[in-house]
Amino acid sequence: MKKFISIGTAIATALLFVAPLPSIAGHWYVGGTLHNATAGEWHKSSYENKLATAANWTLMDPNIRKISNKSSSMETVRPYAIELVACVDQVSAGDSYDKKYVSNLAAACMVSMGW
């Protein structure tokens, strides 16, 4: 009996690392990796990656974070993230921005949009 419990515990533990758990994984705002990217890297990245990264940036603004917390939904952040992606795309267009960090461009966009 003790052997079966050990095997069962081992299997359950292994499943914790393998089986998908209900989490935020797979949502539009998860998985952004462009926080320290250059504009050149930004333009080569997927829209999904840009949007997830922009979601993180938008939540740095206390007013947007407050709106998100009040609604208990990241969907309230989505329009801001979409707008921020569009702004960074537009501002960073052209070869002269390829080596500029998009985090700086995103900050400038947020200021220019009155966030």
Feature map (PLM): residue ranges:
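Bacterial N-terminal signal peptides that target proteins for export
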Residues: 1-11
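Extended interaction regions within the primary functional domain
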Residues: 1-2, 22-25
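Alpha-helical interaction segments
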Residues: 7, 18-19, 31-33, 46-47, ...
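Residues in flexible loops and secondary-structure boundaries
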Residues: 9-15, 50, 61
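C-terminal segment of classical bacterial N-terminal signal peptides
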Residues: 15-23
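N-terminal secretory signal peptides
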Residues: 24-61
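Compact alpha-helical subdomains of small soluble proteins
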Residues: 28-32, 56-115
